[in-house]
């Protein structure tokens, strides 16, 4: 029975190849951004990203508007997994849920150990996230050597991580609230809830309401990407592929993974290395983020899994070796997209962002490399 249950939960090869391709696209776009930021095109790169178009710059439209669609998709995936997927039963939620909490708490503690005072403390949440596109991309490179149950575990953990990141952004990175726009946000959410309760399954009214919801959220002082999650939670769900939730998820999946996330990587991963000193590379901000991702994430995930295994509450099957566990824990240290996003919120328009980005890039790359090396070992068949 347990074997059939595991088999039912294994993600399809099509899904994994889709995620892997998205991860490769994100890596490529980020690398191109780095090339532009350190070449003769640096001035043009910065100029185009900082052109004001309406109320926002080009970078602002990417980070505040397009990324709201990323959070809408993330919210839909979280809702689907909790209702019908890998997290639909408490027994399924326990292992990835506790591992995700451990993987958020320990990196935050390590970051604070390096940056325990002043403005730097605002970045405590930066190393707490896992980039599912990057992580699954690296996992796909290891091929059939990786037991399927680890792919399920990583996917479920990243979903819980996304949920934690959304809560952190809403609670800790919201500015001064404006009453009237905030009231408008509440009114639109109330209207959407009413539509949901009345059984309205046409997507159009939900998407139409999403536009003023985003605008009022932006004006209220709450980060506008939170509007995407709020909208996702009120989209009607269902078991079948024809449900509004599933239809919208399919509509958003390709443009978010292959257009929006690469654009985000291109616009935000570009760090100018001209004039970077050893002191900056070894600054508490850079070291704090890098160490938190590369050491804190795997320690937190492994520690949480070990506690559950020893207590008998949950755990991996016996054929999952320590090499597999450590390898998958290292992949959780690939923070990238969400870490960059939180860094921008924590240190808007400051010189500290470049030091943070160095830590994110170095910590994520080293975590991915360590995870890949460990998972490239001899294949283990699923049982």
UniProtKB/Swiss-Prot annotation:
Protein's recorded name: Na(+)/H(+) antiporter NhaA
Transmembrane segment boundaries: 21-41, 56-76, 94-114, 123-143, 152-172, 175-195, 202-222, 258-278, 287-307, 326-346, 355-375
InterPro entries in the cross-refs: Na/H_antiporter_dom_sf, NhaA
Biological process according to GO: regulation of pH
NCBIfam families in UniProt: NhaA (TIGR00773), PRK09560.1 (NF007111)
Role noted for this protein: Na(+)/H(+) antiporter that extrudes sodium in exchange for external protons.
Membrane topology of the entry: Multi-pass membrane protein
Swiss-Prot/TrEMBL catalytic activity: Na(+)(in) + 2 H(+)(out) = Na(+)(out) + 2 H(+)(in)
Molecular function terms, GO-annotated: sodium:proton antiporter activity
Domain of life (superkingdom): Bacteria
Family: Belongs to the NhaA Na(+)/H(+) (TC 2.A.33) antiporter family.
Family matches, as Gene3D superfamilies: Na+/H+ antiporter like domain
GO CC annotations on file: plasma membrane
Keywords per UniProt: Antiport, Cell inner membrane, Cell membrane, Ion transport, Membrane, Sodium, Sodium transport, Transmembrane, Transmembrane helix, Transport
